[in-house]
Amino acid sequence: MNRVTTESIASTAILVVMVFLFSWRSIEAANVSYDHRSLTIGNRRQLIISAAIHYPRSVPAMWPSLVQTAKEGGCNAIESYVFWNGHEPSPGKYYFGGRYNIVKFIKIVQQAGMHMILRIGPFVAAEWNYGGVPVWLHYVPGTVFRADNEPWKHYMESFTTYIVNLLKQEKLFAPQGGPIILSQVENEYGYYEKDYGEGGKRYAQWSASMAVSQNIGVPWMMCQQWDAPPTVISTCNGFYCDQFTPNTPDKPKIWTENWPGWFKTFGGRDPHRPAEDVAYSVARFFGKGGSVHNYYMYHGGTNFGRTSGGPFITTSYDYEAPIDEYGLPRLPKWGHLKDLHKAIMLSENLLISGEHQNFTLGHSLEADVYTDSSGTCAAFLSNLDDKNDKAVMFRNTSYHLPAWSVSILPDCKTEVFNTAKVTSKSSKVEMLPEDLKSSSGLKWEVFSEKPGIWGAADFVKNELVDHINTTKDTTDYLWYTTSITVSENEAFLKKGSSPVLFIESKGHTLHVFINKEYLGTATGNGTHVPFKLKKPVALKAGENNIDLLSMTVGLANAGSFYEWVGAGLTSVSIKGFNKGTLNLTNSKWSYKLGVEGEHLELFKPGNSGAVKWTVTTKPPKKQPLTWYKVVIEPPSGSEPVGLDMISMGKGMAWLNGEEIGRYWPRIARKNSPNDECVKECDYRGKFMPDKCLTGCGEPSQRWYHVPRSWFKSSGNELVIFEEKGGNPMKIKLSKRKVSVV
Ligand code: GAL
């Protein structure tokens, strides 16, 4: 059975590629306009079912099949944000290589015969580091992000214009024959506008007119922007948008973000939004006259390297989306939504051009009926009751409507789809472990860093500095080091008792080393980032070293003035001396940015000569601040691959110099007694991210996606930097096997 299904998945993959090759067609130049019902592309009104796939969250080798899987799932458009900090790493220096090859990505969408929706932002939120804005911009004097000030407006406009010109040059906008039919400026500014005062309003207006002045020939939108000027379309984001009305009556109803799942944090539980509820929300939207709908995300993918926002957003951005992180359709969600899309599209013309009537069929029961002059008719029958199934009479026929469901009758008679009746197949997902292998036997090379300053200190100060202002996010790591002299007369030395170290930090995480020994870790969590550490310390007479490794785990990506949120230590003291508490906050602190191996780029193939590695077949366990390097063969087969890091502590990993990202198999824990996990999830009733959580007591993220295209046929260099200690002998490459059941 399993073998058969694996083979059938392989042949489906071949088919997907063939369909892709043959479905190439160029889209004709088409002007895009709109009225109160829908977009008009060329001369045709169209319903748009769009799939968000963020290009830097996968690799170019995956793009064609991701786009094709979205198309097979019944989507006719792909949506992505544009990721400013990936494209402009330093002012005026642009990058469009590798995962950031946006032109290549859009051309793949075009070749698949799909439309493209481009959300330029360039502020994007998106659980992406710093909301997509380059960190350097925060340090341009006078800049306040998303507000009415010259530096922000200058850099934001320059970038937007650069992108628009690039895409115009490549003829990617619909009037040029390209796939882009819609664009977005800013992102959900309406939530924050009031915090920015009168200037906020001015900025919103300015960004809309700046966008419109770009003359791209396709409409611009702003999501969740209630006072959006009439030159742009205000759109809706959320779990449900059936009640949404746009900013002016001549605008179509656009749902820019329907969240079919949710994101995850290190230490957080697994969100789950049932397919029935996602389908319900989509059917309600189209039933109520919505005409552009986008799944955020349809493929969430991976926050490779240090791209995740936060703090604490996991490296995986799976999002429980219809296509999973590894690029495989998630069943039954993908299949159920595919069936839904088919049912909706049967009535496309009526939905956008027919006459709409809404009436009640009884308590919590509604009919949305579309008719035209020729007598054709389509109906969406909804049961809004979140507990009781209902029988309804519609046009002399009785229909059974499960609680919280919508039935679609494309001829006002035949129920072709009900959102709560899932007929799609399900799947079983396994991560099949495979030991690391090498043709000449596994040889580990090990390099351990010493806690504290390596080389010379970067600077010395009699205070605790802000972490982010110091590193400017060039690294996660910042060493705060000092030393104290303990007199032989201290009573605790004689009594054998231990003084207590007390540290306060704005976040995000901290490893403590006393006299070059690892003492412990303290960390904030997803909702409360500042933290305190209180731990007994064994001090000796004479000099004692205190080396504190403060870490960021993804910078804040949303909220008013989010770019000013700091991180790092704010107070350090030790209690239990003869004279009481020793306050070290204003002691002499020596600082060092980054860890040594990072500075020497030990993760880059060929850079190994920079330090002296120790070769061993058995690498040490539980050793902090250690680099591991091992040459491996690619895993067998062709399934997608995840690095199993369950045996490790926290750190970063690379394959052949490509950044896999941060790993941290941190256990999903309860922060309050209400933080439960569910055994069964009831799809009925309004969904919230904490409604159907699972994974209590398990690592939030155990496997880390390593794209197949990163492997060479042999001699692959896997490099790991482990901060606190773990057991590298147990690291495995697991193959993701999905069997249809
Ligand atoms: C929205 C935002 C998206 C993303 C989403 C949650 O409010 O626009 O960028 O952050 O929330 O995944």
Curated annotation (Swiss-Prot):
GO terms for cellular component: apoplast; plastid. Ubiquitous. Residues 1-29 form the signal peptide. Keywords: Apoplast, Glycoprotein, Glycosidase, Hydrolase, Secreted, Signal. The active site is at residues 188, 257. It catalyses: Hydrolysis of terminal non-reducing beta-D-galactose residues in beta-D-galactosides. GO terms for molecular function: beta-galactosidase activity. It is an enzyme of class 3 (hydrolase). Its main location: secreted. Transmembrane segments: none annotated. One of its GO terms (biological process) is carbohydrate metabolic process. InterPro entries: BetaGal_gal-bd, Galactose-bd-like_sf, GHD, Gly_Hdrlase_35_cat, Glyco_hydro_35_CS, Glycoside_Hdrlase_35, Glycoside_hydrolase_SF. It is found in: Secreted, Extracellular space, Apoplast. Its EC number is 3.2.1.23. Glycans are attached at residues 31, 358, 396, 469, 525, 583. It comes from the Eukaryota. PROSITE patterns: GLYCOSYL_HYDROL_F35. Belongs to the glycosyl hydrolase 35 family. This is Beta-galactosidase 10. It comes from Arabidopsis thaliana (Mouse-ear cress).
